[in-house]
């Protein structure tokens, strides 16, 4: 019988953060952790085919295994291009 592990699943919005703790069987995947967290039912803006995922800021795939104490992070898509924002800030600084 597999041992149980505890995992956190996090999803952050500008106005609200979600942090769900789940208990899973050892050998569970990132996808199983997200499903067990219930976040897919709470947030219809999460699309596992589009949202990037990580464990403590390191990119992972849905089929990767989670370990006891991991924090699975569901990332939102970027709103603006980081290069463009840096360029705009540089232009603004140069204009001063």
Curated annotation (Swiss-Prot):
Gene3D superfamilies: RnfH-like (3.10.20.280)
Similarity comment: family membership: Belongs to the UPF0125 (RnfH) family.
Protein name per Swiss-Prot or TrEMBL: Protein RnfH
Record-linked InterPro entries: Mopterin_synth/thiamin_S_b, RnfH, RnfH_sf
Species this chain originates from: Klebsiella pneumoniae (strain 342)
Taxonomic path: Bacteria, Pseudomonadati, Pseudomonadota, Gammaproteobacteria, Enterobacterales
HAMAP family with a match to the protein in the record: UPF0125_RnfH
């Amino acid at each position: 019988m597999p041992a149980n592990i505890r995992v956190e699943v996090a999803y952050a919005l500008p106005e609200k953060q979600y942090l769900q703790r789940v208990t899973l069987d050892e050998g569970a995947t990132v996808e199983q952790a997200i499903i067990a967290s219930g976040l897919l039912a709470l947030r219809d803006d999460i699309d596992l085919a589009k949202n990037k995922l990580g464990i403590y800021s390191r990119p992972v795939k849905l089929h990767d295994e989670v370990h006891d104490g991991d924090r699975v992070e569901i990332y939102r898509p970027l709103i603006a291009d980081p290069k463009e924002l840096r360029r705009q800030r540089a232009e603004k600084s140069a204009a001063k």
